[in-house]
UniProtKB/Swiss-Prot annotation:
Enzyme Commission number: 1.17.7.3
Name under which the protein is recorded: 4-hydroxy-3-methylbut-2-en-1-yl diphosphate synthase (flavodoxin)
Residue ranges, compositional bias (Polar residues): 1-15
Cofactor(s) needed by this chain: [4Fe-4S] cluster
Annotated region described as Disordered, given as residue ranges: 1-20
Native source organism of the sequence: Burkholderia mallei (strain ATCC 23344)
Cofactor note: Binds 1 [4Fe-4S] cluster.
Annotated PANTHER family: 4-HYDROXY-3-METHYLBUT-2-EN-1-YL DIPHOSPHATE SYNTHASE, 4-HYDROXY-3-METHYLBUT-2-EN-1-YL DIPHOSPHATE SYNTHASE (FERREDOXIN), CHLOROPLASTIC
Keyword Chaperone listed: no
Binding site for [4Fe-4S] cluster: 322, 325, 368, 375
Gene that this sequence comes from: ispG
Family per record: Belongs to the IspG family.
Protein backbone atom coordinates (compact mmCIF):
# COMPACT_ATOMS: atom_id res chain seq x y z
CA UNK A 1 0.00 0.00 0.00
CA UNK A 2 1.31 3.46 -0.90
CA UNK A 3 2.41 5.47 2.13
CA UNK A 4 1.11 8.97 2.95
CA UNK A 5 4.47 10.47 1.99
CA UNK A 6 4.40 8.74 -1.39
CA UNK A 7 0.81 9.44 -2.36
CA UNK A 8 0.22 11.74 -5.33
CA UNK A 9 -2.08 13.88 -3.18
CA UNK A 10 0.46 14.57 -0.45
CA UNK A 11 3.21 15.30 -2.97
CA UNK A 12 1.22 18.30 -4.17
CA UNK A 13 1.16 19.91 -0.71
CA UNK A 14 3.98 22.35 0.09
CA UNK A 15 4.82 22.79 3.77
CA UNK A 16 6.69 26.06 3.21
CA UNK A 17 5.90 29.02 1.00
CA UNK A 18 7.06 28.15 -2.53
CA UNK A 19 9.35 30.45 -4.46
CA UNK A 20 7.63 31.72 -7.57
CA UNK A 21 10.39 33.39 -9.53
CA UNK A 22 10.00 35.76 -12.46
CA UNK A 23 12.70 36.75 -14.90
CA UNK A 24 16.31 36.54 -13.72
CA UNK A 25 18.15 39.65 -12.52
CA UNK A 26 19.42 41.73 -15.40
CA UNK A 27 22.98 41.03 -16.49
CA UNK A 28 25.31 43.86 -15.51
CA UNK A 29 26.76 45.66 -18.53
CA UNK A 30 28.49 48.91 -19.40
CA UNK A 31 26.01 51.75 -19.94
CA UNK A 32 26.24 53.30 -23.41
CA UNK A 33 24.78 56.78 -23.94
CA UNK A 34 23.35 57.57 -27.38
CA UNK A 35 22.52 61.25 -27.81
CA UNK A 36 21.01 63.76 -30.14
CA UNK A 37 20.45 67.27 -28.86
CA UNK A 38 18.60 67.03 -25.59
CA UNK A 39 17.56 63.43 -26.19
CA UNK A 40 19.51 60.77 -24.31
CA UNK A 41 18.91 57.05 -24.85
CA UNK A 42 21.04 54.85 -22.60
CA UNK A 43 21.64 51.23 -23.59
CA UNK A 44 22.73 48.83 -20.85
CA UNK A 45 23.65 49.58 -17.27
CA UNK A 46 20.48 50.15 -15.26
CA UNK A 47 18.55 51.52 -18.27
CA UNK A 48 15.39 49.75 -19.46
CA UNK A 49 15.65 47.41 -22.45
CA UNK A 50 15.38 49.66 -25.51
CA UNK A 51 13.31 49.12 -28.66
CA UNK A 52 14.86 50.10 -31.96
CA UNK A 53 14.06 49.69 -35.64
CA UNK A 54 15.43 50.27 -39.13
CA UNK A 55 14.13 52.06 -42.19
CA UNK A 56 13.73 50.34 -45.55
CA UNK A 57 13.81 53.50 -47.67
CA UNK A 58 16.56 54.61 -50.01
CA UNK A 59 18.55 56.85 -47.68
CA UNK A 60 19.44 59.11 -50.61
CA UNK A 61 15.73 60.01 -50.60
CA UNK A 62 16.02 62.36 -47.65
CA UNK A 63 12.34 63.28 -47.51
CA UNK A 64 11.05 59.71 -47.74
CA UNK A 65 13.55 58.52 -45.16
CA UNK A 66 12.74 61.34 -42.74
CA UNK A 67 9.03 60.56 -43.03
CA UNK A 68 9.58 56.89 -42.22
CA UNK A 69 11.92 57.70 -39.33
CA UNK A 70 9.21 59.94 -37.90
CA UNK A 71 6.62 57.15 -38.24
CA UNK A 72 8.91 54.70 -36.45
CA UNK A 73 9.71 57.21 -33.71
CA UNK A 74 6.01 58.02 -33.22
CA UNK A 75 5.33 54.29 -32.91
CA UNK A 76 7.83 54.17 -30.04
CA UNK A 77 11.19 53.32 -31.61
CA UNK A 78 13.86 54.80 -29.36
CA UNK A 79 16.64 54.50 -31.94
CA UNK A 80 16.26 54.30 -35.72
CA UNK A 81 18.93 52.81 -37.97
CA UNK A 82 19.38 53.93 -41.56
CA UNK A 83 21.48 52.41 -44.32
CA UNK A 84 24.54 54.45 -45.28
CA UNK A 85 25.92 52.60 -48.29
CA UNK A 86 26.71 55.15 -50.99
CA UNK A 87 28.08 58.68 -51.29
CA UNK A 88 24.55 59.83 -52.11
CA UNK A 89 23.19 58.25 -48.94
CA UNK A 90 25.96 59.74 -46.81
CA UNK A 91 25.37 63.18 -48.32
CA UNK A 92 21.65 62.91 -47.49
CA UNK A 93 22.10 62.11 -43.79
CA UNK A 94 22.53 65.73 -42.61
CA UNK A 95 19.39 66.73 -44.54
CA UNK A 96 17.46 63.85 -42.95
CA UNK A 97 18.60 64.95 -39.51
CA UNK A 98 17.72 68.57 -40.25
CA UNK A 99 14.21 67.67 -41.44
CA UNK A 100 13.61 65.52 -38.37
CA UNK A 101 14.76 68.28 -36.04
CA UNK A 102 12.47 70.71 -37.84
CA UNK A 103 9.55 68.33 -37.22
CA UNK A 104 10.47 68.02 -33.54
CA UNK A 105 11.64 64.41 -33.93
CA UNK A 106 14.85 64.02 -31.93
CA UNK A 107 15.19 60.23 -32.08
CA UNK A 108 18.89 59.32 -32.46
CA UNK A 109 19.92 57.99 -35.87
CA UNK A 110 22.23 54.99 -36.23
CA UNK A 111 24.27 54.67 -39.42
CA UNK A 112 24.45 51.13 -40.82
CA UNK A 113 27.80 50.69 -42.59
CA UNK A 114 29.11 47.78 -44.65
CA UNK A 115 32.16 47.49 -46.93
CA UNK A 116 32.89 51.22 -47.38
CA UNK A 117 32.05 52.82 -44.04
CA UNK A 118 35.62 53.96 -43.46
CA UNK A 119 35.51 55.96 -46.70
CA UNK A 120 32.07 57.44 -46.14
CA UNK A 121 32.86 58.57 -42.60
CA UNK A 122 36.10 60.13 -43.84
CA UNK A 123 34.67 61.84 -46.92
CA UNK A 124 31.38 63.03 -45.40
CA UNK A 125 32.15 64.54 -42.00
CA UNK A 126 28.70 66.13 -41.78
CA UNK A 127 27.21 62.64 -42.06
CA UNK A 128 29.52 61.36 -39.33
CA UNK A 129 28.43 64.22 -37.07
CA UNK A 130 24.68 63.94 -37.82
CA UNK A 131 24.57 60.28 -36.82
CA UNK A 132 24.34 59.38 -33.14
CA UNK A 133 25.83 55.89 -33.41
CA UNK A 134 27.63 53.75 -35.99
CA UNK A 135 27.03 50.09 -36.77
CA UNK A 136 30.20 48.28 -37.90
CA UNK A 137 30.21 44.75 -39.33
CA UNK A 138 33.63 43.12 -38.72
CA UNK A 139 32.85 40.54 -41.40
CA UNK A 140 32.90 42.99 -44.29
CA UNK A 141 34.92 45.98 -43.12
CA UNK A 142 37.83 44.71 -45.21
CA UNK A 143 39.99 41.69 -46.01
CA UNK A 144 43.44 40.78 -44.73
CA UNK A 145 45.65 43.70 -43.73
CA UNK A 146 43.04 46.14 -45.05
CA UNK A 147 40.54 44.83 -42.53
CA UNK A 148 42.54 46.06 -39.54
CA UNK A 149 43.30 49.41 -41.15
CA UNK A 150 39.73 50.08 -42.28
CA UNK A 151 38.26 48.96 -38.97
CA UNK A 152 40.67 51.31 -37.20
CA UNK A 153 39.57 54.20 -39.42
CA UNK A 154 35.95 53.69 -38.39
CA UNK A 155 36.84 53.51 -34.71
CA UNK A 156 38.95 56.65 -35.06
CA UNK A 157 35.93 58.42 -36.58
CA UNK A 158 33.80 57.30 -33.62
CA UNK A 159 36.41 58.71 -31.23
CA UNK A 160 36.77 61.95 -33.20
CA UNK A 161 33.03 62.64 -33.25
CA UNK A 162 32.38 61.14 -29.81
CA UNK A 163 29.95 58.50 -31.09
CA UNK A 164 29.23 55.02 -29.71
CA UNK A 165 29.33 52.01 -32.03
CA UNK A 166 27.63 48.67 -32.35
CA UNK A 167 29.98 45.95 -33.48
CA UNK A 168 27.43 43.74 -35.17
CA UNK A 169 28.47 40.26 -36.27
CA UNK A 170 26.10 38.27 -38.50
CA UNK A 171 26.52 34.65 -39.46
CA UNK A 172 25.54 35.52 -43.03
CA UNK A 173 28.57 37.81 -43.35
CA UNK A 174 30.98 36.30 -40.86
CA UNK A 175 34.71 37.01 -41.28
CA UNK A 176 35.68 34.12 -43.57
CA UNK A 177 39.39 34.34 -42.74
CA UNK A 178 38.61 33.92 -39.06
CA UNK A 179 36.19 31.06 -39.72
CA UNK A 180 38.67 29.24 -41.98
CA UNK A 181 41.44 29.56 -39.39
CA UNK A 182 39.19 28.25 -36.65
CA UNK A 183 38.05 25.34 -38.82
CA UNK A 184 41.70 24.43 -39.45
CA UNK A 185 42.48 24.64 -35.74
CA UNK A 186 39.47 22.49 -34.98
CA UNK A 187 40.58 19.86 -37.48
CA UNK A 188 43.89 19.58 -35.62
CA UNK A 189 42.21 18.87 -32.28
CA UNK A 190 42.40 15.38 -30.86
CA UNK A 191 38.64 15.60 -30.37
CA UNK A 192 37.27 18.11 -32.89
CA UNK A 193 34.24 20.21 -32.00
CA UNK A 194 31.06 19.96 -33.98
CA UNK A 195 30.95 22.40 -36.90
CA UNK A 196 28.06 24.24 -35.26
CA UNK A 197 30.14 24.90 -32.14
CA UNK A 198 32.99 26.26 -34.26
CA UNK A 199 30.55 28.62 -35.96
CA UNK A 200 29.23 29.84 -32.60
CA UNK A 201 32.77 30.38 -31.33
CA UNK A 202 33.73 32.27 -34.49
CA UNK A 203 30.79 34.64 -34.03
CA UNK A 204 31.73 35.31 -30.42
CA UNK A 205 35.44 35.71 -31.11
CA UNK A 206 34.73 38.10 -33.97
CA UNK A 207 32.55 40.28 -31.74
CA UNK A 208 34.69 40.31 -28.61
CA UNK A 209 37.99 40.45 -30.50
CA UNK A 210 36.80 43.45 -32.51
CA UNK A 211 35.54 45.17 -29.37
CA UNK A 212 38.83 44.67 -27.57
CA UNK A 213 40.68 46.03 -30.61
CA UNK A 214 38.43 49.12 -30.49
CA UNK A 215 39.33 49.56 -26.82
CA UNK A 216 43.04 49.31 -27.69
CA UNK A 217 42.49 52.08 -30.26
CA UNK A 218 41.07 54.33 -27.55
CA UNK A 219 37.31 53.78 -27.67
CA UNK A 220 35.78 53.41 -24.22
CA UNK A 221 33.93 50.29 -23.16
CA UNK A 222 31.00 52.58 -22.48
CA UNK A 223 30.93 53.37 -26.20
CA UNK A 224 30.52 49.79 -27.44
CA UNK A 225 27.45 47.61 -27.99
CA UNK A 226 27.82 44.05 -29.32
CA UNK A 227 25.55 41.78 -31.32
CA UNK A 228 25.91 38.28 -32.80
CA UNK A 229 22.90 37.72 -35.03
CA UNK A 230 21.76 34.40 -36.43
CA UNK A 231 18.43 33.25 -37.88
CA UNK A 232 17.78 30.15 -35.73
CA UNK A 233 16.10 30.42 -32.34
CA UNK A 234 18.26 27.85 -30.53
CA UNK A 235 21.38 29.18 -32.26
CA UNK A 236 20.70 32.71 -31.03
CA UNK A 237 20.05 31.56 -27.47
CA UNK A 238 23.22 29.45 -27.39
CA UNK A 239 25.44 32.21 -28.79
CA UNK A 240 24.13 34.97 -26.51
CA UNK A 241 24.34 32.84 -23.38
CA UNK A 242 28.04 32.35 -24.02
CA UNK A 243 28.63 35.90 -25.26
CA UNK A 244 27.01 37.35 -22.12
CA UNK A 245 29.20 35.13 -19.93
CA UNK A 246 32.42 36.25 -21.57
CA UNK A 247 32.08 40.02 -21.74
CA UNK A 248 30.57 43.03 -20.00
CA UNK A 249 29.59 44.97 -23.11
CA UNK A 250 25.98 46.03 -23.65
CA UNK A 251 24.17 43.56 -25.91
CA UNK A 252 21.81 44.15 -28.83
CA UNK A 253 19.38 41.26 -29.40
CA UNK A 254 17.80 40.36 -32.69
CA UNK A 255 16.95 37.28 -34.72
CA UNK A 256 18.22 38.19 -38.16
CA UNK A 257 15.97 37.51 -41.15
CA UNK A 258 13.16 36.33 -38.86
CA UNK A 259 10.72 36.21 -41.77
CA UNK A 260 7.17 37.32 -42.42
CA UNK A 261 3.94 37.34 -40.47
CA UNK A 262 3.27 35.01 -37.58
CA UNK A 263 6.41 32.94 -38.23
CA UNK A 264 8.68 35.95 -37.86
CA UNK A 265 6.84 37.18 -34.78
CA UNK A 266 6.84 33.78 -33.08
CA UNK A 267 10.51 33.08 -33.85
CA UNK A 268 11.65 36.50 -32.63
CA UNK A 269 9.50 36.30 -29.51
CA UNK A 270 10.74 32.81 -28.64
CA UNK A 271 14.42 33.68 -29.02
CA UNK A 272 14.40 37.16 -27.53
CA UNK A 273 11.93 36.22 -24.80
CA UNK A 274 14.11 33.34 -23.62
CA UNK A 275 17.18 35.56 -23.37
CA UNK A 276 15.35 38.43 -21.67
CA UNK A 277 13.93 35.96 -19.15
CA UNK A 278 17.52 35.07 -18.28
CA UNK A 279 18.45 38.74 -17.85
CA UNK A 280 20.37 38.91 -21.14
CA UNK A 281 19.86 41.83 -23.52
CA UNK A 282 19.94 45.63 -23.37
CA UNK A 283 18.23 46.61 -26.62
CA UNK A 284 16.12 44.68 -29.15
CA UNK A 285 15.20 44.94 -32.80
CA UNK A 286 12.53 42.71 -34.38
CA UNK A 287 13.67 41.96 -37.95
CA UNK A 288 10.31 41.25 -39.57
CA UNK A 289 9.76 41.11 -43.32
CA UNK A 290 6.73 43.37 -43.81
CA UNK A 291 3.96 42.25 -46.11
CA UNK A 292 3.53 44.42 -49.22
CA UNK A 293 1.83 47.64 -48.21
CA UNK A 294 2.07 46.92 -44.48
CA UNK A 295 3.48 49.68 -42.26
CA UNK A 296 7.10 49.39 -41.17
CA UNK A 297 5.99 50.25 -37.64
CA UNK A 298 4.80 46.69 -37.05
CA UNK A 299 8.26 45.63 -35.86
CA UNK A 300 8.21 48.38 -33.22
CA UNK A 301 4.83 47.27 -31.87
CA UNK A 302 6.00 43.64 -31.63
CA UNK A 303 9.15 44.68 -29.77
CA UNK A 304 7.14 46.74 -27.31
CA UNK A 305 4.63 43.95 -26.77
CA UNK A 306 7.39 41.43 -26.04
CA UNK A 307 8.76 43.68 -23.30
CA UNK A 308 5.35 44.60 -21.92
CA UNK A 309 3.90 41.09 -21.79
CA UNK A 310 7.07 39.99 -19.97
CA UNK A 311 6.59 42.73 -17.40
CA UNK A 312 9.84 44.48 -18.31
CA UNK A 313 8.37 47.76 -19.56
CA UNK A 314 5.02 49.45 -20.20
CA UNK A 315 4.25 51.30 -23.43
CA UNK A 316 0.48 51.31 -23.93
CA UNK A 317 -2.61 50.02 -22.12
CA UNK A 318 -3.04 46.28 -22.61
CA UNK A 319 -6.30 44.68 -23.70
CA UNK A 320 -7.11 41.26 -22.27
CA UNK A 321 -9.62 39.35 -24.39
CA UNK A 322 -10.81 35.76 -24.43
CA UNK A 323 -10.25 33.63 -27.56
CA UNK A 324 -13.91 32.73 -27.93
CA UNK A 325 -15.60 29.35 -27.88
CA UNK A 326 -19.01 27.77 -28.50
CA UNK A 327 -20.47 30.05 -25.85
CA UNK A 328 -19.51 33.13 -27.86
CA UNK A 329 -21.11 32.69 -31.27
CA UNK A 330 -21.43 36.48 -31.66
CA UNK A 331 -18.44 38.43 -32.98
CA UNK A 332 -19.35 41.44 -30.85
CA UNK A 333 -16.63 40.89 -28.23
CA UNK A 334 -13.99 40.40 -30.94
CA UNK A 335 -15.00 43.59 -32.69
CA UNK A 336 -15.05 45.50 -29.40
CA UNK A 337 -11.63 44.17 -28.34
CA UNK A 338 -10.12 45.25 -31.67
CA UNK A 339 -11.81 48.63 -31.50
CA UNK A 340 -10.60 49.34 -27.97
CA UNK A 341 -7.07 48.13 -28.66
CA UNK A 342 -6.85 50.32 -31.77
CA UNK A 343 -8.31 53.29 -29.90
CA UNK A 344 -5.82 52.97 -27.05
CA UNK A 345 -2.81 52.83 -29.37
CA UNK A 346 -4.05 55.78 -31.42
CA UNK A 347 -4.42 57.89 -28.28
CA UNK A 348 -0.99 57.11 -26.84
CA UNK A 349 0.99 59.85 -28.64
CA UNK A 350 -1.19 62.38 -26.76
CA UNK A 351 -1.89 60.37 -23.61
CA UNK A 352 1.80 59.60 -23.01
CA UNK A 353 2.48 63.20 -22.05
CA UNK A 354 -0.93 64.22 -20.73
CA UNK A 355 -1.69 61.15 -18.61
CA UNK A 356 1.52 59.64 -17.19
CA UNK A 357 0.97 56.10 -15.95
CA UNK A 358 -1.80 55.31 -18.44
CA UNK A 359 0.55 52.89 -20.21
CA UNK A 360 0.15 50.51 -17.26
CA UNK A 361 -3.64 50.37 -17.53
CA UNK A 362 -5.32 47.02 -18.28
CA UNK A 363 -8.65 46.68 -20.08
CA UNK A 364 -10.57 43.39 -20.27
CA UNK A 365 -13.06 42.63 -23.05
CA UNK A 366 -14.63 39.24 -22.35
CA UNK A 367 -17.16 37.20 -24.28
CA UNK A 368 -19.29 35.32 -21.75
CA UNK A 369 -20.12 34.75 -18.09
CA UNK A 370 -17.59 31.95 -17.43
CA UNK A 371 -14.47 34.12 -17.00
CA UNK A 372 -15.89 37.49 -18.00
CA UNK A 373 -16.82 39.01 -14.64
CA UNK A 374 -13.75 37.60 -12.85
CA UNK A 375 -11.28 38.77 -15.48
CA UNK A 376 -13.01 42.15 -15.70
CA UNK A 377 -12.62 42.64 -11.95
CA UNK A 378 -8.87 42.02 -12.20
CA UNK A 379 -8.48 44.75 -14.86
CA UNK A 380 -8.65 48.50 -14.34
CA UNK A 381 -11.70 48.51 -16.58
CA UNK A 382 -13.52 45.45 -17.87
CA UNK A 383 -16.66 44.49 -19.71
CA UNK A 384 -18.29 41.07 -19.84
CA UNK A 385 -20.36 40.74 -22.99
CA UNK A 386 -23.21 38.23 -23.13
CA UNK A 387 -22.50 34.79 -24.55
CA UNK A 388 -24.95 32.59 -26.42
CA UNK A 389 -28.21 32.22 -24.49
CA UNK A 390 -27.19 34.71 -21.81
CA UNK A 391 -29.10 37.79 -20.73
CA UNK A 392 -28.33 40.48 -23.39
CA UNK A 393 -26.56 42.76 -20.92
CA UNK A 394 -22.90 43.70 -20.45
CA UNK A 395 -21.78 44.55 -16.91
CA UNK A 396 -18.88 47.00 -16.70
CA UNK A 397 -16.32 46.85 -13.88
CA UNK A 398 -14.03 49.70 -12.82
CA UNK A 399 -11.22 48.98 -10.36
CA UNK A 400 -12.91 45.73 -9.36
CA UNK A 401 -16.37 47.17 -8.76
CA UNK A 402 -19.42 46.81 -10.99
CA UNK A 403 -20.43 50.34 -11.98
CA UNK A 404 -22.81 49.95 -14.88
CA UNK A 405 -24.64 47.54 -17.16
CA UNK A 406 -24.71 48.34 -20.87
CA UNK A 407 -27.47 47.23 -23.25
CA UNK A 408 -28.53 47.91 -26.80
CA UNK A 409 -26.80 48.76 -30.07
CA UNK A 410 -24.29 51.30 -28.75
CA UNK A 411 -22.35 49.21 -26.26
CA UNK A 412 -19.05 49.81 -28.09
CA UNK A 413 -19.42 53.59 -28.14
CA UNK A 414 -20.53 53.72 -24.51
CA UNK A 415 -17.70 51.48 -23.30
CA UNK A 416 -15.11 53.50 -25.22
CA UNK A 417 -16.40 56.65 -23.54
CA UNK A 418 -16.16 54.97 -20.13
CA UNK A 419 -12.52 54.12 -20.89
CA UNK A 420 -11.79 57.68 -22.01
CA UNK A 421 -13.43 59.18 -18.92
CA UNK A 422 -11.52 56.78 -16.65
CA UNK A 423 -8.19 57.78 -18.20
CA UNK A 424 -8.87 61.50 -17.79
CA UNK A 425 -10.16 61.06 -14.24
CA UNK A 426 -7.48 58.68 -12.98
CA UNK A 427 -4.30 59.64 -14.78
CA UNK A 428 -5.16 63.30 -15.28
CA UNK A 429 -5.29 63.68 -11.51
CA UNK A 430 -1.91 61.97 -11.18
CA UNK A 431 -0.47 64.35 -13.76
CA UNK A 432 -1.86 67.37 -11.89
CA UNK A 433 -0.30 66.15 -8.62
CA UNK A 434 3.07 65.85 -10.31
Amino acid sequence: MQSEAQSPRSSQICSTEPVFGGHAPRRVSHAVDVRWGGTLVTIGGAAPVRVQSMTNTDTADAIGTAIQVKELANAGSELVRITVNTPEAAAAVPAIREQLDRMGVTVPLVGDFHYNGHLLLRDYPDCAQALSKYRINPGNVGQGAKRDSQFAQMIEAAIKYDKPVRIGVNWGSLDQDLLARMMDENGARAEPWEAQSVMYEALIQSAIGSAERAVELGLGRDKIVLSCKVSGVQDLVAVYRELSRRCGFALHLGLTEAGMGSKGIVASTAAIGLLLQEGIGDTIRISLTPEPGAPRTGEVVVGQEILQTMGLRSFAPMVVACPGCGRTTSTLFQELALRIQTYLREQMPVWRSEYPGVEKMNVAVMGCIVNGPGESKHANIGISLPGSGENPAAPVFVDGEKVKTLRGEHIAEEFQQIVSDYVARTYGRAAAQN
